[in-house]
Amino acid sequence: MTALLGPDQLEADLRAIGARLYHDQHPFHALLHHGKLDRGQVQAWALNRFEYQRCIPLKDAAILARMEDPALRRIWRQRILDHDGNSASDGGIARWLHLTDALGLDRTLVESGRALLPGTRFAVQAYLHFVREKSLLEAIASSLTELFAPNIIGQRVAGMLKHYDFVSSEALAYFEHRLTEAPRDSDFALDYVKQHADTVEKQALVKAALHFKCSVLWAQLDALHVAYVAPGIVWPDAFVPDRDASRVAA
């Protein structure tokens, strides 16, 4: 029979899941961070990743709507402000669009979602469905991938600035902000999970939630790798750098 874990052991188990399954282990990220992708492949990554960025505040709004405690809502709503900002030129979504602009992508194309890979769209929609349908505890636990974000962000920024002459530190401003936002958010979520996962069943659910979220991030990179690295099978309506040259800003 499985025993109830203490808070510290539960945290250790959650961190072990991330160490094994977080998307920093995916081959596509190794290629991105070590300068092995060309400009078109980096564009494809940024364009598809925008779908995930766009849906982060939708995910957080869905979680917020299920919180009955005003104090909890006040804390969680900061996540929405972080991404939506206080104006169209502020926040994480605006900063990601600044990155896609800097990479030479047409903003209308990026925002429209017309050129997404199906795998990207399905993975993101699966995540939204998860936080809407599962328990509040599971939804919060699914955000714990942020525990592992600072490490991958550091690798990404350093690697991209070193290897890609078409990327600037200004273009990567999104990641600078996440270096402070992600630890703040994950510290709160981890404390919440450790406090509220107070049965064997709940502890199994929060571990499964983190496992699921890791699979969402991994699936997005699988789609990118299959389409733009090997074997190079691109959905006919998805972004193709050479074919879509007329849809990319000069």
From Swiss-Prot:
The entry's keywords: Oxidoreductase, PQQ biosynthesis
EC number: 1.3.3.11
Molecular function (Gene Ontology), one example: pyrroloquinoline-quinone synthase activity
Pathway as given in its UniProt record: Cofactor biosynthesis; pyrroloquinoline quinone biosynthesis
Reactions that this protein is recorded to catalyse: 6-(2-amino-2-carboxyethyl)-7,8-dioxo-1,2,3,4,7,8-hexahydroquinoline-2,4-dicarboxylate + 3 O2 = pyrroloquinoline quinone + 2 H2O2 + 2 H2O + H(+)
UniProt-listed GO biological process terms: pyrroloquinoline quinone biosynthetic process; sulfur compound metabolic process
InterPro entries: Haem_Oase-like_multi-hlx, PqqC, PqqC-like, Thiaminase-2/PQQC
Family (UniProt): Belongs to the PqqC family.
Function: Ring cyclization and eight-electron oxidation of 3a-(2-amino-2-carboxyethyl)-4,5-dioxo-4,5,6,7,8,9-hexahydroquinoline-7,9-dicarboxylic-acid to PQQ.
HAMAP family hit by this protein: PQQ_syn_PqqC
PANTHER family, A to Z: 4-AMINOBENZOATE SYNTHASE (PTHR40279:SF3), PQQC-LIKE PROTEIN (PTHR40279)
Protein name, as recorded: Pyrroloquinoline-quinone synthase
